[in-house]
Amino acid sequence: MNKISVFKLFLILIVFFTSISCSTNTKKVEYKERSVDEIYNSAMNLLDSKKYKKSSEEFEEVERLHPYSIWATRAQLMSAYVQYKLNDYGASITAANRYIELHPGANDIDYAYYLIALCYYEQINDFRRDQSNTSFALDSFNNLIRRFPGSEYTRDSKLKLGLVKDHLAAREMNVGRTYQDLDNYIAAINRFKIVVDSYSQTSHLPEALARLTELYFMLGLYNEAKVYASVLGHNYPNNKWYIYSYSLFNSKKNNLLSNSKNDKAENIESIDNSDSSIFLKTLDDFIKLFEVEEP
């Protein structure tokens, strides 16, 4: 046998054993036909087991194989929910919006709106960072409350809406304080006014009123200062910001226009609310502090 024949035989043997090996290791995947309710129930069971990825695949299978069934409609909304559980908020919002477009009259359409709001809510950043998602959450919760005032999700939406507004108010207060530190009083006033006008139900209102009172007094605009002092004293007579404002103006009313950093509202934490006997606490006494002769 010549060398060429031996080489050919060797190649034939390699191909033969390779084919045997492949056929042995290859497992035949059998397709098992399932009804639509079987697939949907499988998806729900996986969801209950917190196997969200596999559950998502099963819901997609329902829509792919049975696109015109009632199960497909349900699967579309459940897919949006599963994406929310996977923290894929962008995909969840897209799926929920698609559901709203395809089924605007569905009985559970309010949940799709609620889910969109939740997705934005979960993405809210620290108030010192970009607040785009906070604004989207605000609009989305308001949209749900306006469209579905009797929805079972409205109560929770209102609670979360309050937290969203408080977060946005914190952002405005932070920017306003920064402007005040830089002695840019007009810019600071504009920020604090946003809190008073748009977020009056938040915990930041007393501070905003106190800072507006202080800033207007420092600018010599005593009538404007009186307005905000009146609101502060009437609504928050025992609040530390009222006590701070009174003590500040009572001790510094003749030289508030100095730019001393020690007179700014950052000293609020040093005030003890329990030891307020040193202050005249009536609103009339407070307003009298503003009876400064106009230049």
Task: Label each region the model flagged.
Residues N2-V6, T18-P295:
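Acidic, polar-rich low-complexity tracts and alpha-helical solenoid repeat scaffolds
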Residues L9-F16:
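Hydrophobic helical h-region of N-terminal Sec-dependent signal peptides
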